[in-house]
Amino acid sequence: MSIYTRPVMLLLSGLLLLTLAIAVLNTLVPLWLAHEHLPTWQVGMVSSSYFTGNLVGTLLTGYLIKRLGFNRSYYLASLVFAAGCLGLGLMIGFWSWMAWRFVAGVGCAMIWVVVESALMCSGTSRNRGRLLAAYMMIYYVGTFLGQLLVSKVSTELMNVLPWVTALILAGILPLLFTRILSQQTESRKTTSITSMLKLRQARLGVNGCIISGIVLGSLYGLMPLYLNHQGISNSNIGFWMAVLVSAGIVGQWPIGRLADKFGRLLVLRVQIFVVILGSIAMLTHTAMAPALFILGAAGFTLYPVAMAWSCEKVSQDQLVAMNQALLLSYTIGSLLGPSFTAMLMQHYSDNLLFIMIASVSFIYLLMLLRNARHTSNPVAHV
């Protein structure tokens, strides 16, 4: 029996449309603000407002899923995101856009928690790695296609908002034709995010999500700046970023399958070691294409494997809370990593980007090497 059931395929189809909209807005909002001559610090504050919304949305969604179920939570999340999109057209200004980007951030985080939790509840410990790999592939493909759309269509604010909003609403349609059952309904016990973060046997997965946030946040946010400082043109920067993201897409399925077959611990160790090797290779300034490719293939696949590690340590009724904890950990890493790394790069050297990535990866590798035991019969099962 295929793990890609009808509900899973419809869920991923909706996610693809929503990810297209997310990618387009995340690219164009800073450009629209710059066009309105807002100072750089205000553009940064609007971006921070979006990520703050991500944190709030992550914390809220577990309660909504418990009360409304997966389908209605997904509809609500999409409508919140659509409202955050439409609101941008009401008034252009710093405070207005801070508010609407916060709303959009809440909606996006709700979408991610609902989709990830639904996939984890749909799978078992034996196939969850492949389900999460498919999720990440769809996410990165949607991001890539969103960037392609931006380069091919008019980027005027009032031209973009109608069709982006239509994409968001279209993302609701697939789930109207299926129902994703929440297996938490049998349990009335509420599981807190804090208890999941403190769960000793899942700590390596939580730490992995933090490290993944630091690595991906730094690569996404600071790699273009690094390449620019190396004298690479804007068009070539786009090419190298495409190499990085493409490697992440290509690596998802085989690494997810390997994690299901050989265990998360072994695969995580190899991934982290490869991230360190890729970072060192980038510091040598030779063979940038293979160095970026292996860095992308290993770095962009850390998150789903670390998630699968933690989720096999908890019972079925704790999966949603665990997913919230993992997404929260990733978000914190993606906020703190680029900020700290950017300060180091500004005051010392651009090479600190890869030194930082290699350093945090090495610390995580030591954690993984200390834990020689991997539970062969996980708690979570169907």
Swiss-Prot record:
Principal location: membrane
Keyword presence, Transport: yes
Membrane topology: Multi-pass membrane protein
Localization (cell): Cell inner membrane
CDD domains linked to this entry: MFS_YcaD_like
UniProtKB keywords: Cell inner membrane, Cell membrane, Membrane, Transmembrane, Transmembrane helix, Transport
GO cellular component: plasma membrane
Domain of life: Bacteria
Coiled-coil residue spans: none
Transmembrane segments: 14-34, 45-65, 79-99, 102-122, 131-151, 157-177, 204-224, 236-256, 265-285, 289-309, 325-345, 349-369
Keyword Transmembrane: yes
GO MF: transmembrane transporter activity
UniProt family annotation: Belongs to the major facilitator superfamily. YcaD (TC 2.A.1.26) family.
Name under which the protein is recorded: Uncharacterized MFS-type transporter YcaD
Organism classification: Bacteria, Pseudomonadati, Pseudomonadota, Gammaproteobacteria, Enterobacterales
Gene: ycaD
